[in-house]
């Protein structure tokens, strides 16, 4: 029986886009999948036919050959790529959500043994957790070996068949004009074997989507951008390939009091007008608790005090940084009549004596010189 045109099988125009092909194939695959039609030979044949059509049309080189030469361009007996059950990338069709999460396709298809992809997980911590270290539990979506087929992709009790396209050697010779080029077999991807009876749990992929719960020990002193590598906790490899790694990337949330710059911490300390003028002592917060800070008389806004060793001990070793407290002098508001009278008396007593406000006096002298030079 002659094969139907692949575009006709999928029900699309010859100029259909990749998205249109995928949509059409997904619709047919869901409709005729053996799991949904157990024992229905006609549905199984239609499923295989749709699978074969999509394998060819979703591959740019195979599609070009089919468009130019028809079925002869992709017939294994003619030295082309060939098509058949087991070629379509089910992870691409049924795994859009996970593909988006991991930032792209999964690659590999049903090729040779390949290492699993590395995964990235962003872990948010507060400043105290980052400085002191902590242990957290995370839940990560990943791909693990399919248990029913033990990662082989083949239905239990079945075995992969010799690839009819390359005869089991994993290479094909393509004739391009006067030249003959040897390349990796596009059907078995160099394995020499193909899965003709795929596992219904993983659709022949050998891997299934699953959430994994892991305990992550975060060392003290980490900062935003630091990475913790968990070896072997990434995606499972394909066809016996090694498992990838999981990289936990640290992101430290903003703190309501402290700002961090490397191993040093910074904070702003508001003090009263009178404490700034007369001096005093106040308590300031640190990550280890409150400490007393002595304020000398005549302290101005912007004055910075250093508390040594009250910063962060870097994760890569070395002494702890410092806590730098920047003073912000608050002007009194909501004054009572008596308070206002006292301040007016103070202002009158200071008027004409520049020694009490050296910075202001110098600034006004500069202004006078500026206008005098105009």
UniProtKB/Swiss-Prot annotation:
Homodimer. Disulfide bonds: none annotated. CDD domains: DnaJ, DnaJ_C, DnaJ_zf. The J domain is necessary and sufficient to stimulate DnaK ATPase activity. Zinc center 1 plays an important role in the autonomous, DnaK-independent chaperone activity of DnaJ. Zinc center 2 is essential for interaction with DnaK and for DnaJ activity. Binds 2 Zn(2+) ions per monomer. Residues 5-70 form the J domain. The lineage of its organism: Bacteria, Pseudomonadati, Pseudomonadota, Gammaproteobacteria, Pseudomonadales. This is Chaperone protein DnaJ. The gene is dnaJ.
């Amino acid at each position: 029986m002659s094969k139907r045109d692949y575009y006709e099988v999928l029900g699309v125009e010859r100029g259909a886009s990749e998205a249109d092909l995928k949509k059409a194939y997904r619709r047919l695959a869901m409709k005729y999948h053996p799991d949904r039609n157990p024992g229905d030979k006609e549905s199984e044949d239609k499923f295989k036919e749709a699978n074969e059509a999509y394998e060819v049309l979703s591959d740019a080189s195979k599609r070009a050959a089919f468009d130019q030469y028809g079925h002869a361009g992709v017939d294994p007996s003619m030295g082309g790529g060939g098509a058949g059950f087991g070629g379509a990338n089910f992870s691409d069709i049924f795994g859009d959500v996970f593909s988006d999460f991991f930032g792209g396709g999964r690659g590999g298809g049903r090729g040779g043994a390949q290492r699993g992809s590395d995964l990235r997980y962003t872990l948010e911590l507060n400043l105290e957790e980052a400085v002191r270290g902590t242990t957290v539990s995370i839940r990560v979506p990943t791909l693990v070996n399919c248990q029913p087929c033990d990662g082989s992709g083949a239905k239990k009790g079945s075995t992969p068949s010799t690839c009819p396209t390359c005869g089991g050697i994993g290479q094909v010779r393509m004739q391009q004009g006067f030249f003959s080029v040897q390349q990796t077999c596009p059907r078995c991807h160099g394995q020499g074997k193909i899965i003709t009876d795929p596992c219904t749990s993983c659709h022949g992929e050998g891997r299934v989507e699953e959430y994994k719960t892991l305990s992550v020990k975060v060392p003290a002193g980490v900062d935003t951008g630091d990475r913790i590598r968990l070896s072997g906790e990434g995606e499972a490899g394909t066809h016996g390939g090694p498992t990838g790694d999981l990289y936990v990337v640290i992101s430290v949330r903003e703190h309501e009091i402290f700002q961090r710059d490397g191993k040093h911490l910074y904070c702003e300390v508001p003090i009263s007008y009178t404490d700034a003028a007369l001096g005093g002592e106040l308590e300031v917060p640190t990550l280890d608790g409150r400490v007393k800070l002595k304020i000398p008389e005549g302290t101005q806004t912007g004055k910075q005090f250093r508390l040594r060793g009250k910063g962060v001990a870097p994760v890569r070793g070395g002494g702890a940084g410092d806590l730098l407290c920047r003073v912000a002098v608050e002007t009194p508001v909501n004054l009572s009549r008596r308070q206002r009278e006292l301040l007016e008396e103070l202002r009158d007593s200071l008027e004409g004596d520049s020694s009490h406000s050296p910075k202001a006096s110098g600034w006004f002298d500069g202004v006078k010189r500026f206008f005098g030079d105009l």
